[in-house]
């Protein structure tokens, strides 16, 4: 007597999607679509969420426009927009590296262009020899010192990674700034693609979990760091972190994961 084949759970299917697209990029689109159909049969709610995330990932990777130095024209001019500035490793003594100051200059120019927008500074304590400072607090003080009204600032100073940046920023916005429904990402040019993707995924999943409206990523502005692009696989690793599979994420970062067969 033949036994019915047991269905895989949603997490297994989602991880497969991440691995296929992270490994094969556009060559895996048909496989990703098949996996979305499989996910639909298992959990239609998660299928809807991950369909949105995967479509964003594909478009973000293939058609992303990066705006250097300042946010573009045409964004919402109200206080429903939040400019989110991603932090960067502090010097051992707690001072900011030039790259982080470069991101802040882009953020300040963007904030001056959109004077009603909030500005969120993100990043926890990363100074080896100074546990009293955080990236976000240092960033906020620099912006105040350079003319930004402190009432426009939102500070997320607990995170230790881009994944946590996204999660904790969402929590603050939904608890204290419920009218904000759009964000624009400010970070270094090589980090825009991954940062935007991880924020998108976290925003979609958090909104679904809390039965809340989703906050949309509407644009970006980049500090030109003149560094090599981040490995594409890191985006897959970040998504696995968001799923809660840190072990698989680390294997992806180290390129020691088992590649799926296309």
Predicted regions and their residues:
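Extended hydrophobic blocks
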Residues: 1-82, 89, 167-262
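Short loop/turn segments at strand-loop or loop-helix junctions that form parts
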Residues: 83-89, 121-124
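Surface-exposed cleft-lining segments at the edges of enzyme active sites
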Residues: 89-96, 128-129, 152-155
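Histidine-anchored nucleotide/phosphate-binding helix
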Residues: 97-116, 169
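Short, solvent-exposed amphipathic alpha-helices that sit
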Residues: 102-110, 131-143, 194-205
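Early exported N-terminus immediately downstream of N-terminal targeting peptides
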Residues: 112, 116-127
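A non-catalytic structural micro-motif
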Residues: 118-120, 140-158, 204-222
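Short phosphate-binding loop-to-helix
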Residues: 157-170
């Amino acid at each position: 007597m033949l036994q019915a084949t047991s269905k895989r759970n949603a997490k297994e299917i989602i991880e497969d999607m991440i691995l296929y697209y992270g490994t094969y990029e556009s060559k895996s689109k048909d496989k990703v679509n098949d996996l979305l159909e499989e996910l639909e049969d298992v959990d239609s709610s998660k299928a809807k969420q991950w369909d949105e995330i995967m479509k964003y990932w594909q478009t973000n990777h293939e058609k992303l426009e990066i705006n250097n130095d300042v946010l573009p024209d045409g964004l919402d001019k109200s206080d429903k927009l939040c400019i989110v500035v991603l932090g960067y490793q502090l010097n051992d003594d707690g001072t900011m590296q030039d790259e982080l100051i470069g991101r802040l200059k882009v953020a300040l120019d963007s904030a001056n262009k959109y004077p009603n927008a909030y500005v969120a500074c993100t990043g926890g304590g990363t100074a080896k020899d100074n546990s009293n400072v955080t990236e976000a607090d240092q960033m906020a003080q620099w912006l105040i010192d350079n003319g930004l009204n402190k009432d426009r600032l939102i500070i997320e100073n607990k995170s230790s990674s881009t994944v946590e940046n996204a999660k904790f920023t969402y929590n603050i916005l939904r608890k204290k700034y419920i009218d904000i429904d759009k964000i624009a990402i400010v970070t270094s040019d090589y980090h825009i693609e991954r940062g935007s993707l991880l924020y998108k995924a976290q925003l979609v999943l958090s909104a679904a979990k809390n039965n809340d409206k989703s906050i949309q990523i509407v644009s970006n502005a980049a500090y030109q760091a003149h560094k090599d692009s981040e490995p594409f696989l890191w985006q897959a690793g970040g998504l696995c972190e968001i799923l809660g599979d840190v072990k698989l994420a680390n294997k992806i970062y180290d390129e020691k994961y088992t590649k799926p067969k296309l």
